[in-house]
Amino acid sequence: MGRFRQARGGQAMLETVLAVLFITLMFFALFELSRKVTARILADHAAARAARAKAVGFNDFMCLKSARVALIPVSGRRLWPQEDGWNEVSRVPIYLSAETEGQARAILEYEWWNSTDISVYSGSGLGATAECDVSLRTDDYRVEGRAAVESHFPLYMFDQGL
């Protein structure tokens, strides 16, 4: 009987190691899933911001800047400026007021902004829809967000003859 107990002496430790390994793998899988879900939610939000910017009459560059600002949490490492994050919030309004791409890059630039494809489509006339597709390419996966907003700016920008 004593020999039988000695042969099973490490079973509890082996079960514990396997359980900890399984729990760790589950944690990392859930963490990766949460990263992907967050990126998808933010891509949809960025598409909605760009579509809204187009719906109120902004140009394509302003739509691009609006979507990029919405994607800051999933845009990777900040390339410019290379300081701490304390001044990032104060740079966003300055970035949005930039008139050219070069001027905008001198204010804020992130690692994955170059690989972000933002397309804004708008119809013509009354009741047009602004649609936006945001494709965010990170190191290991691609996320797409879509949004559509009814365009109201023709009501306010053009004389309706009333």
Give each language-model segment a name:
Residues 2-80:
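Alpha-helical assembly-interface signal, strongest on the long, hydrophobic N-terminal helix that forms
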Residues 56-162:
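Short, conserved structural patches
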